């Protein structure tokens, strides 16, 4: 967890436990902790706290300044080995470079799963992994020859998953790996000159479908494919018995976009047939509880549901007021976890496989680019989050790209990018 002091000519740091020094290091503008040294220290002090004392010598403080010490708690539970995310320049419409990347969380190694060079400059998005598996995942590629890439146990296929001339959009794998739930969204955006938020992203319509990867069939349910309601952001329960999703009554858009309030619903799922059952339960009622919900994700133990809350709409990353909210699924009690939220949009998130960690996208640093933050979760509470570590901490500021759609992975994705490129450029 390297860190720095801007403008420093020299930095000294002392890690200590119970008043005894554990590790002492020095550096120029930042502290570069040797990887092996860091790992050994974490292993030695699992479940305990370390005090961190930092001193710096700067132009303003040529004789040095001692900063107030702080503590870090070393979690006993490990985090998943990798995190995947889309790396894209901040903006609204145009781009010339984007990629879905994977980062080794035990080092600073970052490698591409796919870049839009493989897709002739087209959009690549909506990656999703089955139970965090690096061998079973999917992503969309939008361009000539594009489609949905599905990888199962090393076998790669390109599928055209669409209904009513609209492509499948936001995905979530069923935990047994056979089915994928999608919302089919007709996404648009409007720009404003008189508002704090200069852009609003909305759906003209959105429905739910279930895709069967074994039979290559799309399963529709007329209850979730009408013009009265708009459904989006499906998410299976960890046991696979329920499908959660967001739903809002249809409005005249973009004129009524401020009235769009998405609730969270839950419906039984038949694991054998892929069909949705009854009853349809309301987990979060936006019209009673206020605001609008997006990105529901259930903890691996099935006890909690974490979602992104905004005052309205379905694209919280463009809402500065958006924050993460937690529902206890046993009591249905709604919590605002203050430790994890901060000023600036907090949005897409993912649970680790053991349910002890959450990664989420946030614009809390400067309001324009999106960074990744990690938070430890224990006894229904989040601990203070920290940003994705970099070898040089300045990279998070100097790298003018947004990280979005973070998803934990249990291991490294080994992908034949040449084969994927050939598949995406083929019309078949």
Q: What is the meaning of each model-derived region?
A:
Residues 1-428:
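Sequence signature of WD/YWTD-type beta-propeller architectures
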């Amino acid at each position: 967890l390297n860190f720095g002091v801007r403008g420093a000519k020299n930095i000294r740091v002392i890690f200590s436990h119970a008043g005894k020094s554990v590790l002492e290091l020095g550096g120029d503008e930042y502290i570069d902790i040797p990887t092996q040294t860091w790992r050994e220290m974490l292993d030695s002090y699992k479940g305990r706290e370390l005090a961190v004392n930092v001193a710096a010598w700067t132009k303003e403080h040529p004789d040095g300044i001692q900063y107030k010490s702080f503590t870090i708690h070393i979690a006993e539970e490990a985090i998943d080995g990798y995190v995947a995310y889309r790396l894209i320049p901040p903006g609204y419409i145009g781009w010339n470079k984007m990629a879905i990347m994977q980062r080794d969380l035990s080092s600073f190694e970052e490698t591409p799963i796919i870049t839009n060079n493989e897709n002739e400059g087209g959009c690549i998005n909506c990656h999703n992994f089955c139970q965090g598996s690096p061998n079973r995942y999917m992503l969309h590629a939008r361009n000539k020859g594009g489609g949905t890439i599905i990888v199962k146990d090393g076998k790669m296929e390109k599928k055209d998953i669409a209904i009513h001339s609209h492509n499948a959009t936001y995905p979530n794998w069923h935990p047994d790996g056979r089915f994928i739930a999608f919302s089919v969204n007709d996404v648009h955006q409007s720009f404003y000159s008189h508002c704090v938020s200069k852009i609003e992203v909305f759906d003209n319509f959105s429905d739910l479908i279930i895709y069967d990867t074994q039979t290559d069939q799309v399963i529709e349910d007329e209850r979730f494919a009408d013009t009265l309601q708009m459904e989006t952001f499906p998410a299976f329960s960890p046991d696979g018995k329920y499908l959660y999703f967001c739903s809002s009554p249809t409005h005249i858009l973009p004129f009524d976009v401020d009235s769009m309030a998405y609730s969270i619903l839950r419906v039984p799922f038949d694991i054998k047939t892929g069909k949705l059952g009854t009853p349809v339960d309301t987990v979060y009622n936006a019209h009673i509880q206020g605001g609008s919900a997006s990105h529901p994700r259930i903890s691996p133990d099935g006890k909690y549901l974490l979602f992104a809350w905004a005052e309205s709409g379905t694209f919280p990353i463009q809402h500065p007021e958006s924050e993460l909210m937690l529902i206890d699924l046993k009591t249905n009690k709604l919590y605002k976890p203050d430790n994890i939220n901060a000023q600036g949009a907090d949005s897409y998130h993912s649970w680790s496989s053991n349910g002890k960690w959450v990664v989420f996208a946030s614009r809390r640093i400067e309001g324009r680019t999106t960074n990744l933050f990690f938070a430890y979760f224990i006894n229904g509470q989040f601990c203070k989050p920290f940003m994705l570590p970099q070898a040089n901490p300045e990279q998070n500021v100097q790298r003018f790209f947004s990280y979005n759609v973070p998803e934990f992975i249990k291991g490294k994705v080994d992908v034949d990018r040449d084969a994927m490129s050939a598949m995406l450029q083929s019309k078949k």
